[in-house]
UniProtKB/Swiss-Prot annotation:
Residues binding substrate, per UniProt: D51, H91, D99, K293, H298, T340, N379, A380, R418
Species whose genome carries this gene: Zea mays (Maize)
Pfam entry (one): Glyco_hydro_14
Record protein name field: Beta-amylase
EC nos: 3.2.1.2
Any one GO molecular-function label of the UniProt entry: beta-amylase activity
Lineage, uppermost ranks: Eukaryota, Viridiplantae, Streptophyta, Embryophyta, Tracheophyta
Keyword annotations from UniProtKB, A to Z: Carbohydrate metabolism, Glycosidase, Hydrolase, Polysaccharide degradation
Segments traversing the membrane: none
SUPFAM superfamilies: (Trans)glycosidases
Enzyme superclass (EC): hydrolase
Family: Belongs to the glycosyl hydrolase 14 family.
Gene3D superfamilies assigned: Glycosidases
Catalysed transformations (reactions): Hydrolysis of (1->4)-alpha-D-glucosidic linkages in polysaccharides so as to remove successive maltose units from the non-reducing ends of the chains
GO terms under biological process: polysaccharide catabolic process
Length: 488
């Protein structure tokens, strides 16, 4: 029976605080971190997730990496008997929901932007966003002779070389490849730092000179040299109906609108594909799962235009699956997809945002399972209550426990956001411990669940035409139970 029950066990990881390493790239919280890890071990957690900030490690000068602070943290995690998910965080910390510290990308990279601001994502009014380099410079050798993709690849190579002992020992089991702002595969379409507030539709962010030239060339190749980038999609805090693009019968449904949306979302898919290919080469043979994070854009999901998803780069409509295409690309690399907002209920959302996090989660997970991926989730906002935990449990095993073997569907893992003093307050900690046990199908912690195989080389590149074929028809999601059968 234990073997059958074990097939229902979902691993639980917990994110370490954003500032576990200081902005000076030192580790000063050894005692505090050790105590936190002890609490997580006592709660039965499987491991922790940590942001590995590019801006700290290669912050001083190009090609000079300082891993000493991270090695100290990894050592503590190893001593605690926990596994580690490492995020290759090539974005800035600061400017997004929950960012409590400011860790910019390396100064020498930002210096390139002083003479060439187009290395950064740019909106239609010319505002640049310094959180992450535009995917328009992925292949441009602007950084002391290196392209952006070479910067990311070299960073990962240095990580592999300097953390080889932790990789070999099976401590690091997951490499989440950062692909955009907040480490998510998306455009910076809703930046709080530039005045966006929920539930604004956001903006299309493709007006740096590299992406402008790319669009112009694509339009000419398609026989439409007269097409320019959009000028009718509004600004960050508009509602869809205030814009010509998203309005009923708006531009998004015209040939030009469809061409633009396909181009914009394809650029993002290719960006992820190229960087995952580099990550695969770097970690080849390591016992790690490669992963990416997709953002949970749940506002305006309940209207036909899905405006906020479209500006973020997810070309998802009522008749087009914008997540299945991403999942299909991931099959090439056997990579997993990590999705957010697993704790949210529709009933908790304001009606004017036309928000539907539950349906969104069901769509995205169903798309990933149909493509045969390992899927993971995390919560978007700090929650300590049974309602949130029970929603996560429902999404982790949507058809419930199977006493005779693997459940019909289950998450590969869940990452809880995040370690804090509040989490360890008596009542919160007690509830959290119960939650972990329920995720483990009421079994004790087991370090041998879902062992990770050595990484194999990525398969041949999937042509974009083939990726687009899975977008339509948009299939109904798998049925999800209304409530979990193992509540907290």
């Amino acid at each position: 029976m234990a073997g059958n029950a074990l097939a229902n066990y979902v691993q639980v990881y917990v994110m370490l605080p954003l500032d576990v390493i200081t902005v000076d790239n030192t580790f000063e919280k050894e005692d505090e971190t050790r105590a936190q890890l002890k609490k997580l071990t006592e709660a039965g957690a499987d491991g922790v997730m940590i942001d590995v900030w590019w801006g700290l490690v290669e912050g001083k000068e190009p090609g000079v990496y300082d891993w000493s602070a991270y090695r100290q943290v990894f050592k503590l995690v190893q001593e605690a008997g926990l596994k580690l998910q490492a995020i290759m965080s090539c974005h800035q910390c600061g400017g997004n929901v929950g960012d409590v510290v400011n860790i910019p990308i390396p100064q020498w990279v930002r210096d390139v932007g002083k003479s060439n601001p187009d290395i950064f994502y740019t909106n239609r009014s010319g505002l640049t966003n310094i959180e992450y380099l535009t995917l328009g410079v992925d292949d441009q050798p602007l950084f002391h002779g290196r392209t952006a993709i070479q910067l990311y690849a070299d960073y990962m190579k240095s990580f592999r070389e300097n953390m080889a002992d932790f990789l070999d020992a099976g401590v690091v089991v997951d490499i989440e490849v950062g692909l955009g702002p907040a480490g998510e595969m998306r455009y910076p379409s809703y930046p709080q730092s530039q005045g966006w507030v929920f539930p604004g539709v956001g903006e299309f962010i493709c007006y740096d000179k590299y992406l402008q030239a790319d669009f112009k060339a694509a339009a000419e190749e398609a026989g439409h040299p007269e097409w320019d980038l959009l000028d009718d999609a509004g600004t960050y805090n508009d509602t869809p109906e205030k814009t010509q693009f998203f309005a009923d019968n708006g531009t998004y449904q015209t040939d030009k609108g469809k061409f633009f949306l396909t181009w914009y979302s394809n650029k993002l898919i290719k960006h992820g594909d190229k960087i995952l290919d580099e990550a695969n080469k770097v970690f080849l043979g390591c016992k790690v799962q490669l992963a990416i994070k997709v953002s949970g854009i749940h506002w305006w999901y309940n209207v036909p235009n899905h405006a906020a998803e479209l500006t973020a780069g997810y070309y998802n409509l009522d008749d087009r699956d914008g997540y299945r295409t991403i999942a299909h690309m991931l099959t090439r690399h056997r990579a997993s997809m990590n999705f957010t907002c697993a704790e949210m209920r529709d009933s908790e959302q304001s009606s004017e945002a036309k928000s539907a996090p539950e349906e969104l989660v069901q769509q995205v997970l169903s798309a990933g399972w149909r493509e045969g991926l390992n899927l993971a989730c995390e919560n978007a906002l700090n929650r300590y209550d049974a309602t949130a935990y029970n929603t996560i449990l429902r999404n982790a095993r949507p058809q419930g426990i199977n006493k005779n073997g693997p459940p019909e569907h289950k998450l590969h893992g869940f990452t809880y956001l995040r370690v804090s003093d509040e989490l360890f307050q008596e009542q919160n900690y007690t509830t959290f411990k119960t939650f972990v046990r329920r995720m483990h199908a009421n079994l004790d912690y087991n370090p041998n669940v879902d062992p990770v195989a050595p990484l194999e080389r990525s398969k041949a590149e999937i042509p974009i035409e083939e990726i687009l074929e899975v977008a339509q028809p948009k299939l109904e999601p798998f049925p999800f139970d209304k409530d979990t059968d193992l509540p907290v």
